[in-house]
Amino acid sequence: MSAAIELRDVEKSFGEVAIIRNISLSVAQGERHALIGPNGAGKSTTFNLISGYMAPTSGVVLLRGQRISGLPPYQINRRGLSRSFQVTNVFANMSVWENLRCAVLWSTGQRYAFWKNIDNLPEVRERTAQILADINLTARRDVTAGLLTYAEQRALEIGITVAGGADVILLDEPTAGMSHAETERAVALIR
């Protein structure tokens, strides 16, 4: 059985400067791993290499045995890998509900059409409501995401990442700025 994620001799350079040197890593399906290191150690860059936001200078990235290095992020996501970002990445002008619904729609393969009321899709509505409850933002459902506290935005981004339906998830500092109780809820959702 192939690993969920595998990096083989991955390197990333910017000009003459080597940022990532010879990373080899294998993570089995269902395992949880953490990349730990000081600021500037290359943790986020490694996530960018895995998720397609950067291409490796050399080496290969595999998702369940299939080469994904060099693919654009949306194709990697369609193959079952989702990620959150170190800097919160939500649709600031959309409501909490709309942010989550977009991720759920993406995961179900539904496409938005202006003539189709997506709120009439029970599968999408129910899954969105469940994730909203899981991240403890039901009371903030109709609030514009840009008006949420930083911790609430982090929770929303975790919800979006999970809602995408991927079976491999990369979380970049997912609980930064959260209280102890918020962190416990986030960890429970991630498990």
Feature-to-residue mapping (PLM):
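Glycine-rich phosphate-binding loops of nucleotide-dependent enzymes
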Residues: 2-191
